[in-house]
Amino acid sequence: SVNTKNDFMRF
């Protein structure tokens, strides 16, 4: 995704 931080939070 554009925001890696958000991606990690998702998982």
UniProtKB/Swiss-Prot annotation:
The listed locations are:
Secreted
Question: What cellular component terms from Gene Ontology apply here?
Answer: extracellular region
Superkingdom, natural source: Eukaryota
Set out the biological process GO terms recorded for this chain's protein: neuropeptide signaling pathway
Name of the protein in question: CalliFMRFamide-9
Species for this entry: Calliphora vomitoria
Q: Which family does it belong to?
A: Belongs to the FARP (FMRFamide related peptide) family.
| Swiss-Prot/TrEMBL keywords | Amidation, Neuropeptide, Secreted
Q: Which residues form a coiled coil?
A: none
Residues where Phenylalanine amide is found: 11
Keyword Ubl conjugation found: no
